[in-house]
Amino acid sequence: MSANPTGYLHIGHARNAAIGATLCNILEKAGHRVVREYLVNDYGNQMNKMADSIFARYQQIFNPEFPMPEDSYHGGDMIEFAQAFYNIHKDEYKNVEYTDEIRKIFRSFGRDFALKNIIEDMKKFGVTFDIFTSEAEQYAKNRVWPAIHRLKTTYKKDGATWLETTKGGKDDKDRVIIKSNGDSTYFCADIAYHEQKLLELNDPNGKIVDIWGADHSGYVERVKFSFEDLGHRRDQIEILLFQLIRIMKNGKEVKMSKRLGTSLTLRELAEEVGNDAIRYFLIDRSYNSRIDFDINKVTDNNENNPMYIIKYAHARACQLLDKVGIENPIASDELDNEYAQKLVAELKEYPELISTMAKTYKVNLLPPYLLKLSKAFNSFYSNTKVLGSPNEQSLAALVKATKIVLADGLKLMDIEAPEKM
């Protein structure tokens, strides 16, 4: 994940996180070693824009007429950032000249405050990371230029350094990696970052999986080209693109945060509908599909809500096993009941599903499978007597197997599996 540390997380970031975290869980279940990483984009002009915005909002605490820079972040999140800065520094920087040194102070504060909130929101959302990599630190520790100097297909033009990404016909134009004024581009850092990650894996079969918003689709081929240009295999980097999301409520699009006047934040949405509902809905859709997140539908506690059906089936299985009272039931009898056979058939699909998702990265296959399994279990439950039946233990073993798979599938999505509802 790599949301800029310039504000609060929104629903688009949540889709990235939900897909990525679930994919990591599935890959680990399939036997892979997985490293979860957050790339902190703290090098570049967006950080200066944030610093300028916080400084202006801070000055407005003392002088409401203090102007906002035209090219700045005007959302209410910068007001909250400025208030947090004031809570620490009071009037220490009131009316100071806005020099480069002062900008660095506001920039550093903004980055740390944003990252702190991002980590908190992700943790509440059930997403944690093994590594945080700072882009600014990559430059400070000279980890960018060695890779850039090893590129084979660069050339100079108009004072800038270009990478010949049109070679092979997969990009529509060559790309600047170092501007004529000596500043590096975002692409420059991306080139070095991906090589560094592969080297850190220290595995000839290691693979990097990036998850990007579809608005970055134009970057895919140039990143893969640079990866190959450095001598790495193209199949060692996979870039998944996810489409945009609209938030809907009462049939209308919810565009704005009531508190901040910007995009609806993940924190606000989670408070309204809960993390489980967000995660399920975002994972249930193909990456390639634009989705409408309907707040009314995801909060329904009835048969119209797939997540509710799955959770209810798990709770039902737990309750039935409690009534049977056999701790480790063993299937010793042939199950000739058609509903039991259907349930067995569904359960047999689970290992193959895990293998398929680990190979294709299609985590959206998991929710419909769990829904199908839940419906098969509900039919079994409604049409089969378990308690006191002649083959009670075998039927109870089937119920327990269903409970285990439902719980495991929900766990892969970091969604609660309730024992009572």
Task: List each language-model region with its residue ranges.
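Non-catalytic interaction-recognition regions
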Residues: 1-421
